[in-house]
Amino acid sequence: MTHSLKALFALLFLYTAAVNAGVIGIFNALPPPNTKPINGESPLYQCDILDKQLVEIKEVNLDPNPPVRGENLTISANGEVFETIEEGAYIDVEVRLGYIRLLSQTFDLCETLEDNDIEGLSCPIEPGEYNIKKIVEIPGEVPPGKYVVVARAYTEKDDLITCLTGEVIFPPR
């Protein structure tokens, strides 16, 4: 039986929370500087790749890709955690619509794991290889628009866990 990639999953759940809040949907990314595409059927990019990161995200798959309003989205991912991630870890999320900042918020990574019942996972997150799978609902009311999302996770000591980014589009109906 495989373990879940807890840190990655928390970041993906922030993506899910943003979807549920109606601020993001389809990724249509032009890669920002210092990024690399994440393998799989996902338009996510790992950002801040010149900095040491405690998680290597190997693959992310979204089904359907791109996500569809009013339908379930299955998120599958795998990767590796290199160092223990403990209570106090956090995620900074920023969502922009063009030059307008819609959201700039910090979330507790461990609380995010618990609140979303991610296969019963909780901190501390031990080093190792992990696979995850989660199904989330995308509301039909998501407004059209083009958004840029950046999520950076840090340890309680402010070491970079990982960074995810993507440009997101919900077309008009």
Curated annotation (Swiss-Prot):
Record SUPFAM superfamilies: E set domains (SSF81296)
Signal peptide span: 1-21
One Gene Ontology CC term in the entry: fungal-type vacuole lumen
Matches recorded under InterPro entries: GM2-AP_sf, Ig_E-set, ML_dom, ML_PG-PI_TP, NPC2-like
Cellular localisation: Vacuole
Keywords annotated in UniProt: Lipid transport, Signal, Transport, Vacuole
Highest taxon in the source lineage: Eukaryota
Transmembrane residue ranges: none
Pfam families: E1_DerP2_DerF2 (PF02221)
Presence of keyword Cell membrane: no
Propeptide positions: 22-34
Record Gene3D superfamilies: Ganglioside GM2 activator
GO molecular function: phosphatidylcholine binding; phosphatidylinositol binding; phosphatidylserine binding; sterol binding
Coiled coil in keyword set: no
Gene Ontology terms describing biological process: intracellular sterol transport; sterol transport
Role: Catalyzes the intermembrane transfer of phosphatidylglycerol and phosphatidylinositol.
General remark: Present with 2836 molecules/cell in log phase SD medium.
Description of how the protein assembles with itself and partners: Monomer.
Family stated for the protein in its record: Belongs to the NPC2 family.
UniProt-recorded name of the protein: Phosphatidylglycerol/phosphatidylinositol transfer protein
Organism: Saccharomyces cerevisiae (strain ATCC 204508 / S288c)
Designated gene of the protein: NPC2
